């Protein structure tokens, strides 16, 4: 039988369990998932209905061939439709010319002209396409040049996670050569995303980034950006972890610091890792650290980072209606969202269509992630604590629907440490076993899946170097319940919400264009 709801007695919960970074790849080399001992997931894949889901490219609203990511994945899952992403929207606007007539970007340029000030372009300089894209930076530079700006400064945040760990050297060489041909554009600072894009309130990192931008104070100084990266490699730092470095002029002074009346365009379009630095610049009641200097700037966000801030947004979000959380709430169902810090925003904000609001009947549980520099040092992260809590909640009889994310395979996969990734996979498998048993006891069921791959490819198959980025591989989806489910059809992430509603015997709204994966007996 289907999952049925009895409002006057203990509920039999239906769970969506998202194993972040659990991709499917048949090759064993560099595959931490196949190298791990996973008796619980192996048994479920053998005995229960399963299928494959697409998590990348056009299947999730990204350009063809573009790997998926957690933000995109959870948006598609919660919306029950393909959500066209900011990367796609911005790319299209550049191609058709709308980008160069964007009123928000033009206002930032007008502010510079009015005050004879500087334009600062800051963000992740990467072709990864997860948080930003290099083509957007070059489009911004082109726009500034077309409008005759003479003082344009680039503050380079380096990737090393969504692209190989030392991909930045080539990208920075390309950018530096461009700047030398265009004297109105200069690179002013260089630093890894570990500092400029922290999202876990490790304010000491954000402060280092902020001080470099506003004070011209940083652990290192150098005469050019390429040297900054090369010297960091010599210190043993890879792109993500390159300490803030000031690029100096011929007299040894910073090329630029951010001053009053300047304009800033933060070119990242993904919000979660753009918020903390943005707060440091714009919040009156900011408490993360003491700001020695707070320049009064014209601050532009490429996309919406925080709906509570009244800031100009170059590409504002489209409003997603009738998302999974709202449909469940409108039906009077009680739902739980649970994850540790690293993925909490994904099972709440992103799953709710990029909205901060919490629906009626929606409980949220945040388990703190361990305070360590990189998660290869503790591959278990907080998975066991998440599991302890969710098992209690399952057995409480309170919840109709539970949505859970395990961060381990993705976050440890990003470190490039194969053995640590194997431990992460085994940790998650152990937790899956406990949760499935608790669901069985409670008469519940689960769909177990992932938002994108990662841990299944820990090694670059061409170079043998660590592979730290997401993959474009499909992911598995397993149904653990009993009843009349004969099989699952292959699909994409946007089919998960319609499938959950089908199991709950709730008609999907018209806005959900995904389909149920269920094949019934």
UniProtKB/Swiss-Prot annotation:
GO annotation, cellular component aspect: cytoplasm
List of catalytic residues: 70
Catalytic activity: (2R)-2-phosphoglycerate = (2R)-3-phosphoglycerate
HAMAP family membership: GpmI
Record's protein name: 2,3-bisphosphoglycerate-independent phosphoglycerate mutase
Family: Belongs to the BPG-independent phosphoglycerate mutase family.
GO biological processes: glucose catabolic process; glycolytic process
Biological role stated in the UniProt entry: Catalyzes the interconversion of 2-phosphoglycerate and 3-phosphoglycerate.
Pfam family name, one: Metalloenzyme
Keywords: Glycolysis, Isomerase, Manganese, Metal-binding
Keyword Signal attributed: no
Residues annotated to bind Mn(2+) 2: 20, 70, 451-452
Pathway(s) the chain acts in: Carbohydrate degradation; glycolysis; pyruvate from D-glyceraldehyde 3-phosphate: step 3/5
Entry GO MF terms: manganese ion binding; phosphoglycerate mutase activity
EC id: 5.4.2.12
Binding of Mn(2+) 1, residues: 410, 414, 470
Residues reported to bind substrate: 131, 161-162, 193, 199, 270-273, 343
Cofactor: Mn(2+)
Cofactor: how bound: Binds 2 manganese ions per subunit.
């Amino acid at each position: 039988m289907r999952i049925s709801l009895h409002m006057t007695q203990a509920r039999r919960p239906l769970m969506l369990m998202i194993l972040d970074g659990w991709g499917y790849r048949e090759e064993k080399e560099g595959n931490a998932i196949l190298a791990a001992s996973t008796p619980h997931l192996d048994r479920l894949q053998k005995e229960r209905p399963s299928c494959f889901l697409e998590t990348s490219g056009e299947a999730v609203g990204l350009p063809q061939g573009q790997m998926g990511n957690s933000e995109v994945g959870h948006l598609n899952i919660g919306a029950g439709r393909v959500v066209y992403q900011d990367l796609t929207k911005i790319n299209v606007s550049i191609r058709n010319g709308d980008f160069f007539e964007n009123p928000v970007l033009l206002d930032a340029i007008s502010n510079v002209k009015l005050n004879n000030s500087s334009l600062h372009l800051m963000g992740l300089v990467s072709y990864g396409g997860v948080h930003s894209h290099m083509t957007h930076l070059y489009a911004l530079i082109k726009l500034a040049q077309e409008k005759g700006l003479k003082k344009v400064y680039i503050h380079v945040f380096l990737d090393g996670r969504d692209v190989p760990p030392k991909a930045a050297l080539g990208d920075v060489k390309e950018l530096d050569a461009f700047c030398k041909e265009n004297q109105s554009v200069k690179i002013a600072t260089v630093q890894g995303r570990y500092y400029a894009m922290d999202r876990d309130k490790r304010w000491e990192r954000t402060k280092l980034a902020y001080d470099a931008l506003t004070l011209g104070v940083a652990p290192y100084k150098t005469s050019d950006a390429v040297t900054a990266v090369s010297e960091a490699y010599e210190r043993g730092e890879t792109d993500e972890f390159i300490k803030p470095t000031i690029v100096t002029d011929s007299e040894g002074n910073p090329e630029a610091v951010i001053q009053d009346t300047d304009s800033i365009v933060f070119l990242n379009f993904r919000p979660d890792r753009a918020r903390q630095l943005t707060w440091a610049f714009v919040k009156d009641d900011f408490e993360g650290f003491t700001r020695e200097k707070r320049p009064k700037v014209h601050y532009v966000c490429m996309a919406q980072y925080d709906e509570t801030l009244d800031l100009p947004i170059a590409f504002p979000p489209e409003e997603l209606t009738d998302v999974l959380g709202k449909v469940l709430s409108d039906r009077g169902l009680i739902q739980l969202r649970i994850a540790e810090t690293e993925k909490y925003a994904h099972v709440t904000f992103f799953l709710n269509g990029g909205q901060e609001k919490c629906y009626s009947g929606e409980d949220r549980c945040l388990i703190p992630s361990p305070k360590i520099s990189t998660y290869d040092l503790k591959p278990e992260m907080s998975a066991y604590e998440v599991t302890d809590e969710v098992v209690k909640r399952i057995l409480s009889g309170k919840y109709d629907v539970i949505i859970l994310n395990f961060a381990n395979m993705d976050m440890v996969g990003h470190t490039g440490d194969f053995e640590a990734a194997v431990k992460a996979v085994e940790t998650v498998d152990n937790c899956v076993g406990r949760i499935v048993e608790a669901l069985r006891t409670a008469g519940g069921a689960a769909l177990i899946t992932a938002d994108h791959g990662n841990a299944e490819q820990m090694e670059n198959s061409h170079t043998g170097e660590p592979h730290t980025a997401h993959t474009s591989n499909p992911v598995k989806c397993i149904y653990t319940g009993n009843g009349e489910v004969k099989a699952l059809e292959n699909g994409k992430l946007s089919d998960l919400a319609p499938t959950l509603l089908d199991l709950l015997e709730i008609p999907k709204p018209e806005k959900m264009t995904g389909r149920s994966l269920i094949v019934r007996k």
